[in-house]
């Protein structure tokens, strides 16, 4: 699994990778089909509830995306203790990935400013997903891994739509929150469009890595 660090964002890298955004991993077996169906079901729920409220959709995406790394890291940690075996660095890798997604979430919370009711709904959804993903991971690590890859593909679609709405002026642009500027080392004059661009680039790279 690739860990994307908070490095200086490169506009040239962004445009260089735009042609890769429409990549899709075709399911090759039953496990892949289960992962894709599960992902599409969750996408349907998000589409129904949030529609074109892309800031809120991003909050939901990152809330869910922050779970797999933490769940897998915890289970791998327990396995390492139980079998008294070295994890070969995977626990830290998975927890770093969870932290990266958490910072994405914190960024979009500053942008979307979800209400108390929306926060409660998100909390319930996260609790259900944590249990569900843990069960899936224990039953089939391959399926769990593929789910994360398809999540990243769906995130690419959502961020692309979000960026298109911002660039067309349908959604007003705004200054980037300080937390995003500090985390990704963005220029001080950066805007929401720059934040979405960097998230789109990183998510696209993650989707490509996870769906190999």
Which residues are covered by each model-predicted region?
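Acidic, Ala/Val/Gly-enriched low-complexity intrinsically disordered segments
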Residues: 5-7
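Conserved small/polar residues in nucleotide/adenosyl-binding loops
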Residues: 9, 202-207
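Iron-associated oxidoreductase/ferritin-like identity signal
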Residues: 14-204, 212
């Amino acid at each position: 699994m690739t860990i994307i660090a908070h490095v200086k964002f490169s506009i040239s890298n962004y445009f260089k990778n735009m042609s890769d955004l429409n990549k899709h991993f075709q399911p090759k077996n039953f496990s892949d089909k289960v992962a894709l169906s599960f992902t599409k079901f969750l996408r349907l729920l998000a589409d129904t509830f949030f529609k074109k409220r892309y800031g809120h959709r991003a909050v939901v995406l990152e809330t869910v995306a922050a779970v797999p790394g933490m769940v897998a890291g915890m289970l791998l940690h327990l396995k390492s203790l139980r079998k008294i075996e070295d994890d070969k660095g995977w626990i830290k890798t998975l927890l770093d990935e969870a932290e990266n997604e958490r910072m994405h979430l914190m960024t979009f919370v500053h942008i979307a400013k979800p209400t108390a009711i929306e926060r409660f709904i998100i909390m319930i959804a996260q609790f259900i997903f944590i249990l569900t993903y843990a069960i899936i991971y224990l039953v089939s690590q391959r399926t769990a891994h593929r789910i994360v890859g398809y999540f990243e593909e769906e995130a690419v679609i959502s961020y692309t739509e979000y960026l298109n709405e911002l660039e067309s002026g349908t959604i007003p642009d705004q200054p980037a929150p300080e937390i995003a500027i500090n985390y990704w080392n963005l220029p001080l004059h950066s805007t929401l469009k720059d934040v979405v661009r960097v998230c789109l680039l990183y998510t696209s790279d993650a989707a490509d890595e996870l769906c190999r």
